[in-house]
């Protein structure tokens, strides 16, 4: 059975800052939600279901925040799903929300993902031993630095590839008034001059800890017909594998290769390098 068409008809984003002390978690989410609904020309009463995305609870120090957020999210008396896939939660939340429309379960779905890490201690949260998992004792940067070095060695990428990406992203962020960082004049040279944190990752290559939220309104084909400029979802794919399996290729995981192949097939793409103009990772 093929997926039913689904489209994004409303988007909303908050200002991202180190500390959003002007709003609570609920207020932060509603800020993004209200903007998405306004963009879609809808009200909460018209929404069939809500999907909320949130990374580990320890990042804010609130367990299962979707429970106390239900009313603020407009989910009282409606289906509410919480998505949590750690660092990929942003993309996973959008996939789950769109699947509810593509499967014909709902016609109008509101999805919101947020972080408010200023209310907790991210370093402490990342230091808690996870049961039944291999201890790393290195933090996120120390964990991924060897992967970056391996990628550079295996792919033949320049050793300063991270600085190239960082300079590009910082420049693009200047076009988004809601972005956390607005660092004008960031260049490859300025990134390379910043402090080394985990070889080969430098300070200016890393992201800040932010408070912020984003929201989407995803609807069925018949509802999208009333929208002036719907953004159609041409493909959604999710693949998984054991993170710490001894045979797993950490640099080029099988799950990533399988997901990419399935996505190109869904979207009718035969040459990604020629046909894809913009790419974003979560």
Features from the language model and the residues they span:
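Active-site-proximal alpha-helical scaffold in enzymes
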Residues: 85-115, 141-175, 216-222
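Condensing-enzyme catalytic core mediating Claisen C-C bond formation in acyl metabolism
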Residues: 1-26, 163-165, 196-262
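Conserved catalytic cysteine-centered active-site region
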Residues: 2-4, 17-19, 54-112, 116-143, ...
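Generic secondary-structure signature for well-ordered alpha-helical cores
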Residues: 14, 38-42, 71-75, 102-107, ...
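Short, well-ordered amphipathic alpha-helical segments that serve as non-catalytic structural scaffolds
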Residues: 26-41, 65, 93, 144-148, ...
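Buried hydrophobic positions in well-ordered alpha/beta secondary-structure cores of metabolic enzymes
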Residues: 9, 36, 47-50, 97, ...
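Conserved small/polar residues in nucleotide/adenosyl-binding loops
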Residues: 280-282
